[in-house]
């Protein structure tokens, strides 16, 4: 969020530090606020019947007549026919964006939203769809429309994890949230407090027996971490650090050390997130939120002892909401069924950008694996066992649990052989195309695949999007692969829930990274046939990158509250027709973060010149401590920063902060807060700046660095200064970057060089090193924020959340 909270009371001008320019923040007018209010209310508790009388009356019809649309195509006709025949996916059924029939229907519904001539037509169709069409399909189509309609710039929906929390939190938490009853909660004890013995008394046998049974319920077994039984020393167990709350303690199980149970408790304090201090000192924000009853519940990540494997220790990362949301929104921005010409996606080099993101996400995942002593991502094969099983422990909103995969699962044995032949046939075909270096289309046209820009063609093929050449063949392979993983038949309509069928859930599964590694390998296979960069190509005459000083790199686990109010099942409260949002539910979870860091460049230049400065992060050693050669290691580097700068003649000292990174975002403003801001502005009490929340397309800033080690994990950074090569449109010149992602604008990228340059091609180390490059050895330290609580005698506030803990780590880790 790029504004100060004080701006809510008056319009101002802010400085966008990342881009070194002053930017006027736009403020919403009444018409905009009416639209924003509608979007927030129409997805409120989307699985439940619509309760807003205004929208119920509005949604009594759906405009199927062509005159209400700027374009009317075959998908819209087919959708209308399916609606008349009652052949649409029913409400309450699982929706999979990568299920063939679901995707076709979703495309038809999206077109009705996207091509609506005016807001009234759009709003009427949305209200009707909310009441009568499948919930998952509705949100999918609506999200695409809000992102891609040119006249919707600045309008937002709640984050996907706030619309459908069920896709991001385990079934135990979801069931507790959905059965939350405020009246019952008021009548019962606020806490079922499970205290440690605060006064350090030796327990009686009965108290020991109670604790022992609870320990069994938590699955802790009968032994200590030292192998000693509770029976032998139950009288002194409270005097040691081996109390059951610490027995199976992991960093993200913080509530055990505070004596809190996994149930709802109420706090009048502020919502936790990393930028909350911008708000909780502001009187307007405090006034706005004072009447909201806030309830919190600790939530864990999934760790299934029955399907335990080495990937289980990474669940805090693979199940991170920001990590999964990034992939979801990338595939909303560049949806496989949106053509590049109509939506302008070709202006953004959509195929290359999608494929480069696959590579970058795999690089980031690989670095997290190294933090835990794990090595390369395992190779994927359709004809070998998948060693790593996975149980997502998710439950769909219709009550059906997600399917799971056992360890050493054989894809070939349990699959549909016809589908498998088509999938493997595609993979073999594209590998042959890359090796041959050309492709002959059905009309006999020859396409040269030995040019660098041909990576766009390869990317479109691998994503299976509609811009792929011969898209009848290439478009469906990607969808078929995901359907095969989910054991879903080609013509199946009602599908069992599976994480691999939706973008927002698939990154939870270790198999995702194995499969997408096979996709990235085609990218590297293509690059193998391009000539290596020569010293002359890499050299920037007159520019020397003399030194880079990097500040301390520290990661830690912090706490955050995610808004899960959409899972409430109680009665909605209305006053004079106006909805009263009087209570909110929050999932309190521990997640990976890092201390802000910076680096300072010392660059000598022989002349004034506009340049682009790039920064990469990568491993230095493999899991066995062996140094990785640059030739092999180039594939493991992740680009963390790029920006333009005008060098002056002589020495240039440039300081760059992690908070300046253009591609990352902080925590998004919660659904509850956004709705209150909208209503207050609608009533004329506040101004509503359009940059009120972070753009949806940003990568989580807190996940830039891998976890690292307590003693320090050796890594390396690479920096390079290159001449500025202008893209088709200057970056951010055609859209407002403070609230828009500029999808299809052609102005998203800093220059026209290939993504990942200079690591995109294979390296000749004799030619590679030039004065405008700089390698820097760095160390990433992991700080244990819960360490002070390990000795229970130092903590006396059991059964309550310790807000001083949040203050302490905020001060310690967020200040440079």
From Swiss-Prot:
Instruction: Write out the entry's keywords from A to Z.
Output: Secreted, Signal, Storage protein
Residues annotated as coiled-coil are none
InterPro entries, alphabetized: Di-copper_centre_dom_sf (IPR008922), Hemocyanin/hexamerin (IPR013788), Hemocyanin/hexamerin_mid_dom (IPR000896), Hemocyanin_C (IPR005203), Hemocyanin_C_sf (IPR037020), Hemocyanin_N (IPR005204), Hemocyanin_N_sf (IPR036697), Ig_E-set (IPR014756)
Summary of the tissues where the protein is detected: Larval hemolymph.
Q: Which GO terms describe its biological process?
A: energy homeostasis
Question: What Gene Ontology cellular-component terms does the record carry?
Answer: extracellular space; larval serum protein complex
What molecular functions are annotated in GO for this chain? nutrient reservoir activity
Which family is it part of?
Belongs to the hemocyanin family.
Function, please? Larval storage protein (LSP) which may serve as a store of amino acids for synthesis of adult proteins.
> Which SUPFAM superfamilies does the record match to this protein?
Di-copper centre-containing domain, E set domains, Hemocyanin, N-terminal domain
Signal peptide: which range, if any? 1-16
Keyword field contains Signal: yes
**What is the originating organism of this protein?**
Drosophila melanogaster
Keyword Nuclease attributed: no
* Entries under Pfam families matching the protein: Hemocyanin_C (PF03723), Hemocyanin_M (PF00372), Hemocyanin_N (PF03722)
- Quaternary assembly: Heterohexamer, composed of three subunits, alpha, beta and gamma.
Which protein, by its recorded name, is this? Larval serum protein 1 alpha chain
Q: Where does it reside?
A: Secreted, Extracellular space
Query: The organism sits in which domain of life?
Result: Eukaryota
Principal location: secreted
